[in-house]
Amino acid sequence: MLTGALGAGVIALLLIFLTRGPPAPAAEAAASAPFAGGAAAGGGPPPDISNMSPRERFDRLYNRIMTAAENGDEGTVTNFSPMALQAYTMLDTVDADARYHAALIKLHTGDIDGATALGDTILANSPGHLFGYIVLGTVARFRKDDAGLKKAYSGFLSHYDAEMKAGRTEYTDHARSITDFKKAAEAERSPA
């Protein structure tokens, strides 16, 4: 019961944040943020996330966090990560893509064990899924675990062709991450 109340509280805070207007100096910057739904997203008021599905809420928060991380905005990453992870727990169904998103958020917030568990779960539920190897390889690189990184690279490369032929939508959505990890894996495999 406490978890439900906590979740409702997080969502309520998120609704308040999204529906109230930003301070005047930040209005222009906020309008161009991918989560804000301002002018850059087609104009008009911020989106009413109460009408969004749990997956849409989670994806919007994930996108905002990743954009902030790419721009070095640790404050946004820190502020929105708990909301995104709470939204993740509210998903009706959890697929490899959602687990991958949650794992990346956990990596950005220092929850390495949580990210590892999600990477393992991706591979347990979808053997050979490239996201599992990307998560586990990223964790291994962070931990300076050369054997773990080599294992992740090897698994990734051994499943790459078959997985790409599967035509998974999430692979198209994360093509850059897959390409970057593949290049790193091939560079590791090739003699210098």
Each model region followed by its residue ranges:
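Alpha-helical adaptor scaffolds
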Residues: M66-S126, V135, K151, S158-D161, ...
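Structural signature of alpha-solenoid helical repeat junctions
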Residues: E56-R57, T76, V94, G128, ...
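Long, contiguous interaction/recruitment modules in multidomain scaffold/adaptor proteins
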Residues: M1-R60
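Terminal, low-structured helical/coil segments at or just beyond the last alpha-helical repeat
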Residues: K151-A192
